């Protein structure tokens, strides 16, 4: 009976280790996540002025969530899609957002950017 318990524990530990590895090396960032990070930026993207602290915090969160090239390319495509879908987003305001927040996320904010060129 003890061997079964020990074997079961080893198998459980193996499964947990595999799942943690999958979570750590998970897929690239997803558009709903990108949209959530930058939802507070919509007023700025439409009207200009100064982005809110919550907008800049979201931009910082996006930077942290997109450390790899693949993540940045996905985030870029998400941003491009939103910019071309939501009416009233000003491309010039979008391009200025990273500088206004003091955050370089490595993803240009533009409706026309080639996201495949991002490193």
Swiss-Prot record:
A single MF term (Gene Ontology): lipid binding
UniProt record, GO biological process: lipid transport
Q: Note the superkingdom of the native organism.
A: Eukaryota
By its UniProt entry, which Pfam families does this protein fall under?
Answer: Tryp_alpha_amyl
SS bond list: 31-78, 41-55, 56-101, 76-115
Q: Where is the signal peptide?
A: 1-28
What this protein is called in its record is Non-specific lipid-transfer protein 11
Q: What is the lineage of its organism?
A: Eukaryota, Viridiplantae, Streptophyta, Embryophyta, Tracheophyta
């Amino acid at each position: 009976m003890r061997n079964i318990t020990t074997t079961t524990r080893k198998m459980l530990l193996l499964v947990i280790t595999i799942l943690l590895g999958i979570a750590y090396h998970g897929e690239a960032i997803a558009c709903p996540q990108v949209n959530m990070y930058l939802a507070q930026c919509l007023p700025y993207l439409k009207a200009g002025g100064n982005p809110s602290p919550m907008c800049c915090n979201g931009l910082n969160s996006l930077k942290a969530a997109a450390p790899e090239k693949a993540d940045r390319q996905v985030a870029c495509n998400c941003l491009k899609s939103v910019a071309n879908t939501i009416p009233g987003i000003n491309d010039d305001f979008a391009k200025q957002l990273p500088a206004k927040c003091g955050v370089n996320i490595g993803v240009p904010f533009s409706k026309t950017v080639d996201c495949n060129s991002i490193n």
